[in-house]
Amino acid sequence: MLAIENRGLHITTEETVTSPLVRTTRLTSAYRRFLTSADAPRFAAEVDEFYSPATLTTLLSRGDIEMRRASALSLGMLGNRSSIEPLGRALGDPDRGVRLASDDSFRALLVREAAPLHHQKLLKVMHLNDGGEHAAALAPAMILVDQAPKYAEAHHQLAICWQGLENYYQAESAYRSCLWRCRFHYPAWQGLARCWLMLGETDRALSALELCLQICPDVESARLQIRAIRRRRRQTDA
């Protein structure tokens, strides 16, 4: 270990240089082990020992590609409500691997951000919506929104209920409530666009789809919808 003395100060290169490199290596090393082993609990434990969610959030925006990928993955396991917006920004990262990891973590935290009781109720509503049982999902979704009004995903699921029941005005209102609480919720932008299309608001639908793609460039279905709308417009104008 090299010691440097200057004006009575005793500083070591280990303290000024090596320590930050060790912290960096711990995260990337844990990430590489995870890619080989797929042992998520071990990865989470290794990262949690040395990194706070705030530090991971910083690395998500400032680290190199591997560091950003590792941070995005970690935040899905160790993050909290304050991690949702940074992950939402990372959905537009130049690296596709970062975008994919951020998307998985973003969706996980949207579902997990509420209290455990509300989380379980949301999972029930999601299960009903996924099965197309929108009428059965409506009442528990409305109760959940009333009990946990800050829970963005609850508003999203309520919007899906209304949309499935072809009540597009109520669905529009619920999608807006979701986006008011989480502006990076790109599935809500896409759902809102579908409502506006059904209500004949083509320009607004296009704007919502473009916002969806600005947030998450990998939503190919939104890109296809934009092309279809523009193609129909050209055919109508002709």
Features from the language model and the residues they span:
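Amphipathic alpha-helical scaffolding segments comprising HEAT/armadillo-like alpha-solenoid repeats
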Residues: 11-25, 46-61, 80-92, 114-123, ...
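Conserved structural position within tetratricopeptide repeats
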Residues: 61, 92, 111, 143-146, ...
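Helix-start (N-cap) detector for alpha-helical repeat units in TPR-like alpha-solenoids
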Residues: 65, 118, 152-153, 186-187, ...
